[in-house]
Amino acid sequence: MLVTLGLLTSFFSFLYMVAPSIRKFFAGGVCRTNVQLPGKVVVITGANTGIGKETARELASRGARVYIACRDVLKGESAASEIRVDTKNSQVLVRKLDLSDTKSIRAFAEGFLAEEKQLHILINNAGVMMCPYSKTADGFETHLGVNHLGHFLLTYLLLERLKVSAPARVVNVSSVAHHIGKIPFHDLQSEKRYSRGFAYCHSKLANVLFTRELAKRLQGTGVTTYAVHPGVVRSELVRHSSLLCLLWRLFSPFVKTAREGAQTSLHCALAEGLEPLSGKYFSDCKRTWVSPRARNNKTAERLWNVSCELLGIRWE
C-alpha cells in the first residue's frame, strides 16, 4: 500500500513538474490574423465568463462594438467593465439574454434590432453541460433547449441583420463530444430516458448539424457559418458534475485556459479566406473531421424542420 502510494505521489509530482511543457503542447492553434474591427458589431452569447469573455475581450481590443448577451446581467456588467478597462474600448455593452426562455430571446432580439442597423459577427457561445434533468420555460429538455434551440431561434431572429451587413459570420461553439452524440428524434425531450452526459453530447451534435444546414441555406447571401471545438478548457460548465469538478482540479495544469480556448472561435470569426469552408467544423484553428452522424444531410434537414416546428417558426 505504501509502495503504491509512493509511486502515485511520484507520478503526479512528475506530471506537475512537466506540466508547462505538456500545456504548451496541448495549447492548440492560435488565431493569427491581425484584422481590425472598427465600425463592426458583434454579439456573443454567454460572454460574461470563460471562453466567451476572452472572445469578447479580443474582439473589443480590435475596435468592435461588442454585445455581451447573458442571463446574469450583474456578472455581464462586471466582465464588460473589466474588458473596457483592459481594451480602452467603451463600446462593450451588456444585454439580458436567457436562452432557456424564448420570450427572453425574442426580447433580446427586438431590443438589439432597435439599437443596431448592422451585425457582422454572431458567436453562439453560451451553453450548459451535464445538468440534472430539467426543462426550459418552454418545455424543452435543458441541453437541447439552451445549447441548440435557443441559439437556433436567436440566429433566425438576427439573420436579416446579418445579411444586410454581409460579409458576416455565425460561429457556433460545439464540442468534440458531438462524436458520441445522436439525435433521438423519438425522444427529443429525454422523457423516456435521460443521461446528463449523453444529453450534452446530443446537443453538441445538433450544433454541428445546424451549422451544416445553415451554410447550405445561406449560399449566395454573404453570410457564412462555422462550428468549433474550443478544446478541453477550464470552464464553469462542469459545475453540475462533482466528478468533472474533481478531475478539473487534478488536471487543470494540463488543460487550456479560457484565452486559449477562445482561439478557434476567433479564427472562424476573423480569418480571411474561410468562405469556401462555410458549414465546416474547426478545432485548433483548422478544419477537422466530424462524426458520420454529423455529415448526414438528411438528419441535418430533419433536425432543422423539427426545430422550426418546436419553436413555431417558418425558416425556409
From Swiss-Prot:
Reported effect, residue 239 to W: In retinal dystrophy; exhibits a profound loss of catalytic activity
Positions with a binding annotation for substrate: 175
Pathway annotation: Cofactor metabolism; retinol metabolism
E.C. code: 1.1.1.300
Result, substituting residue 55 to M: In retinal dystrophy; exhibits a profound loss of catalytic activity
Keyword annotations: Disease variant, Endoplasmic reticulum, Leber congenital amaurosis, Lipid metabolism, Membrane, NADP, Oxidoreductase, Retinitis pigmentosa, Sensory transduction, Vision
Keyword Lipid metabolism: yes
Binding site for NADP(+): 46-52
Compartment annotation: Endoplasmic reticulum membrane
One Pfam family cited in the UniProt record for this chain: adh_short
Active site per UniProt: 200 (proton acceptor)
Recorded consequence of changing residue 274 to P: In retinal dystrophy; exhibits a profound loss of catalytic activity
Main location per the UniProt record: endoplasmic reticulum
Keyword Lipid metabolism: yes
Tissue expression per record: Widely expressed, mostly in retina, kidney, brain, skeletal muscle, pancreas and stomach.
UniProt record similarity statement: Belongs to the short-chain dehydrogenases/reductases (SDR) family.
Reported function: Retinoids dehydrogenase/reductase with a clear preference for NADP. Displays high activity towards 9-cis, 11-cis and all-trans-retinal. Shows very weak activity towards 13-cis-retinol. Also exhibits activity, albeit with lower affinity than for retinaldehydes, towards lipid peroxidation products (C9 aldehydes) such as 4-hydroxynonenal and trans-2-nonenal. May play an important function in photoreceptor cells to detoxify 4-hydroxynonenal and potentially other toxic aldehyde products resulting from lipid peroxidation. Has no dehydrogenase activity towards steroids.
Other notes: Shows clear specificity for the pro-S hydrogen on C4 of NADPH and the pro-R hydrogen on C15 of retinols.
Record's disease association: Leber congenital amaurosis 13: A severe dystrophy of the retina, typically becoming evident in the first years of life. Visual function is usually poor and often accompanied by nystagmus, sluggish or near-absent pupillary responses, photophobia, high hyperopia and keratoconus. Retinitis pigmentosa 53: A retinal dystrophy belonging to the group of pigmentary retinopathies. Retinitis pigmentosa is characterized by retinal pigment deposits visible on fundus examination and primary loss of rod photoreceptor cells followed by secondary loss of cone photoreceptors. Patients typically have night vision blindness and loss of midperipheral visual field. As their condition progresses, they lose their far peripheral visual field and eventually central vision as well. RP53 inheritance is autosomal dominant or autosomal recessive.
Protein name: Retinol dehydrogenase 12
